[in-house]
């Protein structure tokens, strides 16, 4: 029974937390991933994230190619629902996740001295993510494994694929769906700093990745081609108590050139900084709140600009945890 109680406490600390943006950031603000997303938990765990995001700036928060108009003033309210399944791949920890964005986006554009307005609402492009650990601890397969878990230094392989199924209007440039296949390959790294004490857990997390894009053959009647976008995300996370933690977040993104109807425009760089706060409500329910903003938000600037606020709630469950809870409660 002592093992069951210890595992219950450990489960509260290590419950799987999703917040998106990931994706997003291209699912939640240009697909940037929330801190602690790639912490490992018991294989076989199921998780359902629900994410709400509000973003503003001059770039579509659902387009990681950063195809933007400096004169634009955009606002987006996005909700994201998903499902994730932790599963071993051979002797390695793995995960398969699906995320579906929905909501509305609108914006004003200055063209020829006059102001025009565009808007889009409905579903965005769904994303599928595959994750496999390359370096790090063995998969957490049972209760004793969970008690012994420490991330140490771990590195994963992540492959994302976004399907062109979202709302798209070929008469305008602003859409929830992007009308093309695109995806990401990356290697997220989690580095444990110091001892793994529940109320003082500290990690440095780094995620280099590259986005690859297919062609959009009907971008306002023309063909849009985008070179790869390179991203580097970093998070320094720290527990303040056993249930409450925070993170300092930074993202650097360098988009490739875009070619529309044979005319090429140069890519742009963007640096965002912000914070995330997380709270483990109970062993199966987690809450995160985060904010990020580009460093240069001067009015009239030709730089990429974005402000993003996100809140997420994630629930998770596993048959072993549920069984342990029933035994510990005498049910």
Q: Where do the PLM segments sit?
A:
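Outer membrane beta-barrel transmembrane domains
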Residues: 61, 216-331
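Outer-membrane pore/translocation modules
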Residues: 104-226
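Surface-exposed strand-loop-strand hairpins of Gram-negative outer-membrane beta-barrel proteins
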Residues: 55-78, 113-116, 170-175
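Short loop/turn motifs that connect adjacent beta-strands in outer-membrane beta-barrel proteins
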Residues: 36-44, 87-95, 136-154, 194-202, ...
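Residues on the lipid-exposed face of transmembrane beta-strands in outer-membrane beta-barrel proteins
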Residues: 50, 80-85, 128-134, 159, ...
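Residues that define the transmembrane beta-barrel architecture of outer-membrane proteins
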Residues: 44, 73-81, 121-128, 153, ...
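Transmembrane beta-barrel strands of outer-membrane/channel proteins
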Residues: 48-54, 96-104, 155-163, 202-212, ...
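N-terminal signal peptide c-region/cleavage motif recognized by signal peptidases
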Residues: 26-28
């Amino acid at each position: 029974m002592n093992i069951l109680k210890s595992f219950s406490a450990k489960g509260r600390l290590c419950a799987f937390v999703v917040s998106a943006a990931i994706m997003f950031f291209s699912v939640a603000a240009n697909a940037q991933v929330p801190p602690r997303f790639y912490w490992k938990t018991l294989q076989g765990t199921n998780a359902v994230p629900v994410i709400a995001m509000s973003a503003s700036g001059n770039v579509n928060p659902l387009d990681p190619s950063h195809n933007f108009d400096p004169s634009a003033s955009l606002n987006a309210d996005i909700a994201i629902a998903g499902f994730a399944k932790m599963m071993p791949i051979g002797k390695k920890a793995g995960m398969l996740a699906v995320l579906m964005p929905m909501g509305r986006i609108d914006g004003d554009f200055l063209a020829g001295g006059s102001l025009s307005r565009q808007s889009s609402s409905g579903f965005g492009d769904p994303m599928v993510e595959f994750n496999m650990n390359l370096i790090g601890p063995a998969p957490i397969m049972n209760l004793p494994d969970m008690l012994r878990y420490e991330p140490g230094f771990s590195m994963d392989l992540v492959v994302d694929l976004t399907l062109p199924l979202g709302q798209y209007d070929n008469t305008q440039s602003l859409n929830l769906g992007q009308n093309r296949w695109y995806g990401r390959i990356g290697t997220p790294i989690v580095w444990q700093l110091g001892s793994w004490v529940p109320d003082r857990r500290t990690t440095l997390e780094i995620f280099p990745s590259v986005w690859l894009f297919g062609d959009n053959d009907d971008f306002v009647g023309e063909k849009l081609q985008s070179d790869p976008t390179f991203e580097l995300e970093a998070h320094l996370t720290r527990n303040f108590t056993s249930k409450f933690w925070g993170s300092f977040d930074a993202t650097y993104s360098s988009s490739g050139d875009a070619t529309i109807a044979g005319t090429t425009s140069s890519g742009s760089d963007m640096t965002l900084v912000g914070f995330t706060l997380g709270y483990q409500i109970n062993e199966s329910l987690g809450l995160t709140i985060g904010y990020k903003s580009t460093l240069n938000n001067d009015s009239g600037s030709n730089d990429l600009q974005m402000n993003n606020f996100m809140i997420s709630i994630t629930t998770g469950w596993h048959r072993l945890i549920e069984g342990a809870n029933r035994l510990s409660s005498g049910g």
